């Protein structure tokens, strides 16, 4: 059933190291967590996010696994994980499943959350050079590298200017979010619009 639903998974080499390796593992018998890992990777790939790394390990408890897989956008990765579990369950139950809906939802998540063209090109080039990146917000604020070598960019503006710092300092919510991400204690602030909210 999995081959019929995902014929493109023939490209998954898995630990066998050859084309069709994953399907060989399924026929021999493999953990369900391993199947979920490959489904999560494949549905992202079908949605235009080429992700290829995944690992599944046992927890020591039967039927419970640690599953790790790559993603391009965190929201898409979370969606893919949940969808992969639903898809695997439908395969086990031999029930029909609307795969196209999940792929379309993943495409929409990608479009809503991915970096813009300029920032995306800079991040792609950094990755080619082996420079890690961290996305610092849902927009285009990105940290390239770590420690004393880190640089930050927002769209195409680099941290070598004061522009990014001024923009962040002018935005109270973003400032608090970045400080909190760095484990710096920040008082929570909320907007109160009614007298009842004061209580």
Give each language-model segment a name.
Residues 97, 147-148:
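Flexible hinge/switch segments at interdomain interfaces of large molecular machines
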Residues 69-79, 85, 97-138, 157:
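Low-complexity, highly charged intrinsically disordered N-terminal segments
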Residues 140-145:
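Short polybasic amphipathic segments
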Residues 30-31, 79, 117, 121, ...:
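Generic alpha-helix structural propensity
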Residues 34, 149-150:
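Short amphipathic alpha-helical patches
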Residues 1-102, 109:
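Long, compositionally biased, glycine/small-hydrophobic-enriched stretches that function as flexible linkers
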Residues 1, 151-199:
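Active-site nucleotide/adenylate-binding loops and adjacent lid/helix of ATP-dependent enzymes
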